[in-house]
């Protein structure tokens, strides 16, 4: 067993060190073999041999740790020499293309701002009133169960949508209002099509009663979707949202299969892209507005980016793999 420590002293790198460890301490190593021999011994001879094995094993383990420390320090020193960088040398900064989510945000903003929509940014932390109650979602409303919310102890929460920005804007301004808001939102969900943090964009137009009609909303939405996706077909479906009445959802013809039917569109030929509607009077009453009308719409930025980039896993946008991000 003296030869084990002698072999250890001759080790010069991590690979040889691991080989020495396995030959001594592995399942088929020298010490395992010695301990296995104890079953053939009896009495004092067995006890004496066991003590001797333990003595050499402890000596080897101590020598191994010292050698391991020395090898790691030596390899680190060698690596630092090889990786030494001359900071005085010029090095061109590597740039890449815009992140798909940033590209999508900018494309949306470029459409709405020339139409007179003002970009509003709100807080990520909200209270119950702005996130729920003011949007016709009182505490007992079943629609709250659809949103797994991150709550804080002081009755604050991480906003589950960007709609609170609309409430703040209406509280701070008087009609006419024409705004869009975008940013991070949070819900407790994580799978191929959901992440705990995601981005939304919403729009709001408010003016004196009778000045804003559903036809205005329809025109804006159709112009935007044709601008964003090109020559796609559109389908309007009636829907329900507590904060709009009437409400609608808009689908586009599948960009993956051209309506021939595929797994992405569930073989329907249609893909849901946004929800919209005329602002519910209950929302205006919560703000204190009278004799006004307006429309609102909202969509997920990741959803739009997934369709334009034609990817199936939403989580790809949040990974730091440059090979993936540079492919968009």
From Swiss-Prot:
Subcellular location: Cytoplasm
Cofactors that this protein relies on: Mg(2+)
Biological processes, Gene Ontology terms: phenylalanyl-tRNA aminoacylation
Alphabetized InterPro entries for the sequence: aa-tRNA-synth_II, aa-tRNA-synth_II/BPL/LPL, Phe-tRNA-synth_IIc_asu, Phe-tRNA_ligase_II_N, Phe_tRNA_ligase_alpha1_bac, Phenylalanyl-tRNA_Synthase, tRNA-bd_arm
Catalytic activity: tRNA(Phe) + L-phenylalanine + ATP = L-phenylalanyl-tRNA(Phe) + AMP + diphosphate + H(+)
Major subcellular site: cytoplasm
GO terms for MF: ATP binding; magnesium ion binding; phenylalanine-tRNA ligase activity; tRNA binding
Broad EC category: ligase
Binding site for Mg(2+): 245
Cofactor note: Binds 2 magnesium ions per tetramer.
GO cellular component: cytoplasm
Gene3D superfamilies from the UniProt entry: Bira Bifunctional Protein, Domain 2
The protein's Enzyme Commission number: 6.1.1.20
Keywords from the UniProt entry: Aminoacyl-tRNA synthetase, ATP-binding, Cytoplasm, Ligase, Magnesium, Metal-binding, Nucleotide-binding, Protein biosynthesis
Assembly, per entry: Tetramer of two alpha and two beta subunits.
Family: Belongs to the class-II aminoacyl-tRNA synthetase family. Phe-tRNA synthetase alpha subunit type 1 subfamily.
Name of the featured protein: Phenylalanine--tRNA ligase alpha subunit
Species of provenance: Helicobacter pylori (strain Shi470)
